[in-house]
């Protein structure tokens, strides 16, 4: 009964019947075949004579008819039951077979897995064993290398010990050591300078070798300096010649007057150390050609035919002949070629008066220095032919070299060495003092022209950042000659214990000059006091420069001497001086130079000069943002020499004004009244190319989104569109460490605000410790960084981030002070992610937060509004002012419930302590489907930002202008579709606050086209240029559901602190056009209600006047007057 089609099923009451095929089902007999056997005893009913054989009886039909239907049904049921049982058995057999096969396959699979795992473990073990072997081999190689290195070191040490032993046991006739190349070069330079010392009698002003020509050694108050000696022809520093037929009775020691400023004790101690330095091979710090920086300056060698003798006028000598040009000494401290007299600058330089009469050019000398009016007549006069330009440039250069060399060696000049270069104003004071004789003028003018030539040559070749200043030229030349001549420098002579001066005409002349000089100092002091009062009244007193921690005490002393003693030509700008930036550049660009060498490189900048070599040619100083200290400086008249008799007793000394550093003005021009330079009241733009140096060492800008091309592209776009020409370009500077510490910790400031070469010097408290070099991670590109995207450049990043902060400070201070209308800072790296002690998200120092703090501290700005529309939340700015009620921080950023960088900025973060309610976060949620666009940002400004800002009423508005929400930025760094045009309109709305004092600072944004378009739109709005109108589709569009939900939540939270936003909750879903119409209708309704209320009040007042009874005390008209 096994059926091949056992899987078929049956429907109905007997499903098991389907197990059998239909053919078998039809073969089931309907009737039961019964083969009856008749009883044998039964006679045949039909027998008769049929032959006797019984015939079978046909009972089929009868039996069939007689079978019971019930029996048939039972039989069928039994058969069906049997079939069902057989089917169940078959099912059980099949299931048992399936289970058996499944178990078998499972066991096979487990065996295969175990085998595979065993193979993997064996392979892993083999790999680990190979790595262990490789590491072991590497370790063995390293150990072998170390052993080899140790052996080499031991061998080298043994060799050195052997050499030292040989040197110790050497004979006296042998050399003691083999000098290095540097020692050889310095020794050769020393020997050459010694060999070039002139022989006596070389020129007409040389001192004859006669024993009587050397005077006595005059002792000074400083008895610690030993007497100097030298070979023949080199006079000792304190032995003085008696020139010509001058009688030795008139020789008198020099006396120190009250007009000479005392030098700092520290400078004196350092000078004493320099004097005691005996070996010429040691490093000299008093020369200008020894230091690394000064090696770049021009070294003028070569001497004219017939070298002159060495300096014939030394301090302490009697009055010498005017024929020696080196004895021409001006009152302002220029000593010409006198190598043994340190220069000291008086606080005020002399300027030419407008009335150039001959009497006003009468010259006199300082009574503490040798006079030039005694002795023989000068053989050189100055004529117009001597001041004529040489036709050949090479001849003129050769003449200048010979002149300088001759002056270094103590000789004088002839007419052919004169130059036509204009004399700087700071040197004109030299020509106003000295002898009134024509020969005194000639000798003095030679010095002035020669010093100017040397300054110009050194300026053309020296490093641009540290150009030579006319105020320092005299000292540079003097120190240079001291280096070449190898004559020791000593301190200025002090008051001696000598007898009173003889009553000679020369002595009387010096007394008169001393009295006049004291009168001049008194007048000068009065002028300074009056000028200080004027500046204080007008509120334009310049700020004192804040010192950088990296400036040493010696550098500060040197700068004060330059600014006060020599008369600095410019006043420091806000919080910084040019000398500070120069000092920082020295530290960063030439780190091997020490502080003493950098002291000599202080630059006194011109007001019109560039900020440095790093600044592009199009960056110029648009005007002095902070007024000069001396407002009476005037253009100078050309220098003219008059031959006038000396009449010191009758000509009063005129107080001279401070001179400019520019050359003298052409003759005949009248000096216009000096007015303080003011900025145009327009938009200021600040940018500095030094910020371009902050980049990864790999140099691949495609890997790093925050690269230097961002600000370069924006600057180029503003130039191409002509917007830059309408703006005031502001010179940037580097922020000081003290300014940065207003927001950041000292540890963070030192770590990211200093370069590794000067970090240890500045870290006096040892805050960084030994781990300062281990704070950075190695990036996949090969560079280093704070994290995976915030790169760091050890050499340039510290200066670049400080420059970004300083640029924004300069711009914001000028806007807050009313010098500029508004401003846009093109700076990088950004800063709004930088927290107090954490650098992240391309940010190191929070420029906007530092600016807000300093505006409040230094300019007393009351309330500051910071609007941050960067797509990333400004977690650093929020942290800085979270508890400050004077700074309102409003941020519009993508939040996505904390799933977007940096994850902060929830709407519930409203501030803490007294600053509750002064932190507003418009945190967009819902992702980028649909993206947030113009409609949503404009709606947020209409309903949240501007109402709260107007109620806050800030004094200054700072904007963290990140443009990564502009369309074109992909989702990881953006994802929104705000147009660049929209940011222009947002800027225009912010300009209605704080009287228009709005400063935008570039933050994020990495698509160059997008940030250029947005920057152009913002600058156009700041300049009040007509903006492109928004599309009508934008005005008709309604904000999306996610934005409406975000704004509803923000209004719900902020309405507890700002009641002005509550009325906008109902109209968040309206389009801009509908909102404008509603606001217009509301305004008209309010106006109508106001008119109705006024009319009703007037009617009520009139009715009250009509019905009110007349007071009893008021008499009626008909009543007679009493």
Swiss-Prot record:
Modified positions (Phosphoserine) in chain numbering: 259, 498, 611, 661, 1108
Protein location: Nucleus; Cytoplasm
Comp. bias (Low complexity): 312-327, 494-504
Top class in the EC scheme: hydrolase
Active-site residue list: 833
Outcome following mutation: residue 259 to A: Reduces AMPK- and caMK-dependent phosphorylation and the subsequent nuclear export. Abolishes nuclear export. Does not affect phosphorylation by PKN1 and PKN2
Chief place of localization: nucleus
Gene3D superfamilies: 6.10.250.1550, Histone deacetylase domain
UniProt cross-references to InterPro entries, sorted A to Z: HDAC4/5/7/9, His_deacetylse, His_deacetylse_dom, His_deacetylse_dom_sf, Hist_deacetylase_Gln_rich_N, Ureohydrolase_dom_sf
Biased composition, class Polar residues, residue ranges: 328-340
Family: Belongs to the histone deacetylase family. HD type 2 subfamily.
Assembly: Interacts with AHRR, BAHD1, BCOR, HDAC7, HDAC9, CTBP1, MEF2C, NCOR2, NRIP1, PHB2 and a 14-3-3 chaperone protein. Interacts with BCL6, DDIT3/CHOP, GRK5, KDM5B and MYOCD. Interacts with EP300 in the presence of TFAP2C. Interacts with ANKRA2. Interacts with CUL7 (as part of the 3M complex); negatively regulated by ANKRA2. Interacts with ZBTB7B; the interaction allows the recruitment of HDAC4 on CD8 loci for deacetylation and possible inhibition of CD8 genes expression. Interacts with RARA.
Protein name (database record): Histone deacetylase 5
Protein species of origin: Homo sapiens
Source species taxonomy: Eukaryota, Metazoa, Chordata, Craniata, Vertebrata
């Amino acid at each position: 009964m096994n059926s091949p089609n056992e899987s078929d099923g049956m429907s109905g009451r007997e499903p098991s019947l389907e197990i059998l095929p239909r053919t078998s089902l039809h073969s089931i007999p309907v009737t039961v075949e019964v083969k009856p056997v008749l009883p044998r005893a039964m006679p045949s009913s039909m027998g008769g004579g049929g032959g006797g054989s019984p015939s079978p009886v046909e009972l089929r039909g009868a039996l069939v008819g007689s079978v019971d239907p019930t029996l048939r049904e039972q039989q069928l049921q039994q058969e069906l039951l049997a079939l069902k049982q057989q089917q169940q058995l078959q099912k059980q057999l099949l299931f048992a077979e399936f289970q058996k096969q499944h178990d078998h396959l499972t066991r096979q699979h487990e065996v295969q897995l175990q085998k595979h795992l065993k193979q993997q473990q064996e392979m892993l073990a083999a790999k680990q064993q190979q790595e262990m072997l490789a590491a072991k081999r590497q370790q063995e190689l390293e150990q072998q290398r170390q052993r080899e290195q140790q052996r080499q070191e031991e061998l080298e040490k043994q060799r050195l010990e052997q050499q030292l032993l040989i040197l110790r046991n050497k004979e006296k006739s042998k050399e003691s050591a083999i000098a290095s190349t540097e020692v050889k070069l310095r020794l050769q330079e020393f020997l050459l300078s010694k060999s070039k010392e002139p022989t006596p009698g070389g020129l007409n002003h040389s001192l004859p070798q006669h024993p009587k020509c050397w005077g006595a050694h005059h002792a000074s108050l400083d008895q610690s300096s030993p007497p100097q000696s030298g070979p023949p022809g080199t006079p000792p520093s304190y032995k003085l010649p008696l020139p010509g037929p001058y009688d030795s009775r008139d020789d008198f020691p020099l006396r120190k007057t009250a007009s000479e400023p005392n030098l700092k004790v520290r400078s004196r101690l350092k000078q004493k150390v320099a004097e005691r330095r005996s070996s010429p091979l040691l490093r000299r710090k008093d020369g200008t050609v020894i230091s690394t920086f000064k090696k770049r300056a021009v070294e003028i060698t070569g001497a004219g035919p017939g070298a002159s003798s060495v300096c014939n006028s030394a301090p302490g000598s009697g009055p010498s002949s005017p024929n020696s040009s080196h004895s021409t000494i001006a009152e302002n401290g220029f000593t010409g070629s006198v190598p043994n007299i340190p220069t000291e600058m008086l606080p005020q330089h002399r300027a030419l008066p407008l009335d150039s009469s001959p009497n006003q050019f009468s010259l006199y000398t300082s009574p503490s220095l040798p006079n030039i009016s005694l002795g023989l007549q000068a053989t050189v006069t100055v004529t117009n032919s001597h001041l004529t330009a040489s036709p050949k440039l090479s001849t003129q250069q050769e003449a200048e070299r010979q002149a300088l060399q001759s002056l270094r060696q103590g000789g004088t000049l002839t007419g052919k060495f004169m130059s036509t270069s204009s004399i700087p104003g700071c040197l004109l004071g030299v020509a106003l003092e000295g002898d009134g004789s024509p020969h005194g003028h000639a000798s003095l003018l030679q010095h002035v022209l020669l010093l100017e030539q040397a300054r110009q040559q050194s300026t053309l070749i020296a490093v641009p950042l540290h150009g030579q200043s006319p105020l320092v030229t005299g000292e540079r030349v003097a120190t240079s000659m001291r280096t070449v001549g190898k004559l020791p420098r000593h301190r200025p002579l002090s008051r001696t214990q000598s007898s009173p001066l003889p009553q000679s005409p020369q002595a009387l002349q010096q007394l008169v000059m001393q009295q006049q000089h004291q009168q001049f100092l008194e007048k000068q002091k009065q002028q300074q006091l009056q000028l200080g009062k004027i500046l204080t009244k007008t509120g334009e007193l310049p700020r004192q420069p804040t010192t950088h921690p990296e400036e040493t005490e010696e550098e500060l002393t040197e700068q004060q001497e330059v600014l006060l003693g020599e008369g600095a030509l410019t006043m420091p700008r806000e919080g910084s001086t040019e000398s500070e930036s120069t000092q920082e550049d020295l530290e960063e660009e030439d780190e091997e130079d020490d502080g003493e060498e950098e002291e000599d490189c202080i630059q006194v900048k011109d007001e019109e000069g560039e900020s440095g070599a790093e600044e592009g040619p199009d960056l110029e100083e648009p005007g002095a943002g902070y007024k000069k200290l001396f407002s009476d400086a005037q253009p100078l008249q050309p220098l003219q020499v008059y031959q006038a008799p000396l009449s010191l007793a009758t000509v009063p000394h005129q107080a001279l004004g401070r001179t400019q550093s520019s050359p003298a003005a052409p003759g005949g021009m009248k000096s216009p009244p000096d007015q303080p330079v003011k900025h145009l009241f327009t938009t200021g733009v600040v940018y500095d190319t030094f910020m371009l140096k902050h980049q990864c060492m790999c140099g691949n800008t495609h890997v790093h989104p925050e690269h230097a091309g961002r600000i370069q592209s924006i600057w180029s776009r503003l130039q191409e569109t002509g917007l830059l020409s309408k703006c005031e370009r502001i010179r940037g500077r580097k922020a000081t460490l003290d300014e940065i510490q207003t927001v950041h910790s000292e540890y963070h400031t030192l770590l990211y605000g200093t370069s590794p070469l000067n970090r240890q010097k500045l870290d006096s408290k040892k805050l960084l410790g030994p781990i300062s070099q281990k704070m950075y991670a190695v990036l996949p590109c090969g560079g280093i960084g704070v994290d995976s995207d915030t790169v760091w450049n050890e050499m340039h990043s510290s200066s670049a981030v400080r420059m970004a902060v300083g640029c924004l400070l300069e711009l914001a201070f000028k806007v807050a002070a009313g010098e500029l209308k508004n401003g846009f800072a093109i700076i990088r790296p950004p800063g709004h992610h930088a927290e107090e002690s954490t650098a992240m998200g391309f940010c190191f120092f929070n420029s906007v937060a530092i600016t807000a703090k300093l505006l409040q501290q230094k300019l007393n700005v009351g309330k500051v509004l910071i609007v941050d529309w960067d797509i990333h939340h400004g977690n650093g700015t929020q942290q800085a002012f979270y508890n400050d009620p004077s700074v309102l921080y409003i941020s519009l950023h993508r939040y996505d419930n904390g799933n977007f960088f940096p994850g902060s900025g929830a709407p519930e973060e409203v501030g803490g302590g007294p600053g509750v309610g002064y932190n507003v976060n418009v945190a967009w949620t819902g992702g980028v489907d649909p993206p947030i666009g113009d409609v949503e940002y404009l709606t947020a400004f209409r309903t949240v930002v501007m109402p709260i800002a107007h109620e806050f009423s800030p004094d200054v508005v700072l904007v963290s202008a990140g443009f990564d929400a502009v369309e074109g930025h992909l989702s990881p760094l953006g994802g929104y579709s705000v147009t660049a045009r929209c940011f222009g309109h947002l800027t225009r709305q912010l300009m209605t606050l704080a009287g228009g004092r709005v400063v935008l600072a570039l933050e994020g944004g990495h698509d160059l086209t997008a940030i250029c378009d947005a920057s152009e739109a913002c600058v156009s709005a700041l300049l009040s240029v007509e903006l492109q109108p928004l599309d009508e589709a934008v005005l008709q569009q309604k904000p999306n559901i996610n934005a409406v939900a975000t704004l509803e939540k923000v209004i719900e939270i902020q309405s507890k602190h700002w009641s002005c936003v509550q009325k906008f909750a109902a109209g968040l879903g309206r389009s801009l056009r509908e909102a404008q119409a509603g606001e217009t209708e509301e305004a008209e309704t309010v106006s109508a209600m106001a008119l109705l209320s006024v009319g009703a009040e007037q009617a009520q007042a009139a009715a009250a006047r009509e019905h009110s009874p007349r007071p009893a005390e008021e008499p009626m008209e008909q009543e007679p007057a009493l």
